[in-house]
Amino acid sequence: MIVGLVGEVLKKEPTYLHIEVGGVVYEVFISLNASAAIDKKQIRLHTTHIIREDSESLYGFVDINEKKMFDRLIKLNGVGPKVAIAICSTFKPQEFVQIVQQKNVAMLKKVPGIGPKSAQRILVELGEFDISESNVTSSAFQEASMALQSLGFKKEQIQKALQECTATDTASLVKEALKKIQKL
């Protein structure tokens, strides 16, 4: 499984990009929100690797919460990667959480390919959907954030650096975030 890519963007279109990693070029499908967030040549993407009988696809995300949202959506009945990426393109993760919590069928119907019945079913199946990290990872992120704040870094810098981190324990998160903040 490919869970992340770090490399150079060779071609960028609104719904996909080509990224070169170690001499190999990957086609990675992205949401419109991710496309808008990618503004540099060197990038790090969280990915979901989908292997089917007749195809293999990579879906990339700048924001880990968008990846979680996508991963949760593709587990639902009748929601494939195309519909899931359309939802990710239409709503940012926090907006989607609110839509699910409010059971807002009208908003979900705005997504291309989702009608009233599909919207209702998705909202019922998601139930109490939340994109927050698991308790362990979430507390590690909170502790790392507090540690970095105590070192005098701004919340915006910390948030941006932590979103790009792959570590799950506090000490590793702080180390990785410090390296990323230095590059900002």
Swiss-Prot record:
GO process terms (BP): DNA recombination; DNA repair
Regions annotated as coiled coil: none
Location of the region described as Domain II in the Swiss-Prot/TrEMBL record: 63-134
Keyword line: Cytoplasm, DNA damage, DNA recombination, DNA repair, DNA-binding
Spans annotated as Domain III: 136-184
Keyword Hydrolase annotated: no
Any Pfam family matching the protein: HHH_5
Subcellular locations according to the entry: Cytoplasm
Region of interest called Domain I, as start-end residue ranges on this chain: 1-62
Residue ranges, annotated region (Flexible linker): 134-135
Gene Ontology molecular function: any one: four-way junction DNA binding
GO (cellular component) term, any one: Holliday junction helicase complex
Similarity annotation: Belongs to the RuvA family.
Description of its domains: Has three domains with a flexible linker between the domains II and III and assumes an 'L' shape. Domain III is highly mobile and contacts RuvB.
Subunit structure and binding partners: Homotetramer. Forms an RuvA(8)-RuvB(12)-Holliday junction (HJ) complex. HJ DNA is sandwiched between 2 RuvA tetramers; dsDNA enters through RuvA and exits via RuvB. An RuvB hexamer assembles on each DNA strand where it exits the tetramer. Each RuvB hexamer is contacted by two RuvA subunits (via domain III) on 2 adjacent RuvB subunits; this complex drives branch migration. In the full resolvosome a probable DNA-RuvA(4)-RuvB(12)-RuvC(2) complex forms which resolves the HJ.
Function noted in UniProt: The RuvA-RuvB-RuvC complex processes Holliday junction (HJ) DNA during genetic recombination and DNA repair, while the RuvA-RuvB complex plays an important role in the rescue of blocked DNA replication forks via replication fork reversal (RFR). RuvA specifically binds to HJ cruciform DNA, conferring on it an open structure. The RuvB hexamer acts as an ATP-dependent pump, pulling dsDNA into and through the RuvAB complex. HJ branch migration allows RuvC to scan DNA until it finds its consensus sequence, where it cleaves and resolves the cruciform DNA.
Protein name as catalogued: Holliday junction branch migration complex subunit RuvA
